[in-house]
Curated annotation (Swiss-Prot):
Family: Belongs to the bacterial ribosomal protein bL33 family.
Lineage of origin: Bacteria, Bacillati, Bacillota, Bacilli, Lactobacillales
Annotated Pfam families: Ribosomal_L33
GO molecular function, one term: structural constituent of ribosome
Organism field: Latilactobacillus sakei subsp. sakei (strain 23K) (Lactobacillus sakei subsp. sakei)
Name under which the protein is recorded: Large ribosomal subunit protein bL33A
Length: 49
């Protein structure tokens, strides 16, 4: 089952990315390096509820 998730920047805490994931394949929270427009650099983004 695919679920909608929001990605939050770990440095500025801005929620700038929406995505979806398969909970069966990825039961834990996703952590991806993405571009943060507020910081203007690539930072670690974590999944939020």
């Amino acid at each position: 089952m695919r679920v909608h998730i929001t990605m939050e920047c770990t440095e500025c805490h801005e929620r700038s990315y929406l995505s979806n994931k398969n909970k069966r394949n990825n039961p834990d929270r996703l952590e991806l390096k993405k571009y943060c427009p507020r910081e203007r650099k690539v930072t670690l983004h974590r999944e939020t509820k």
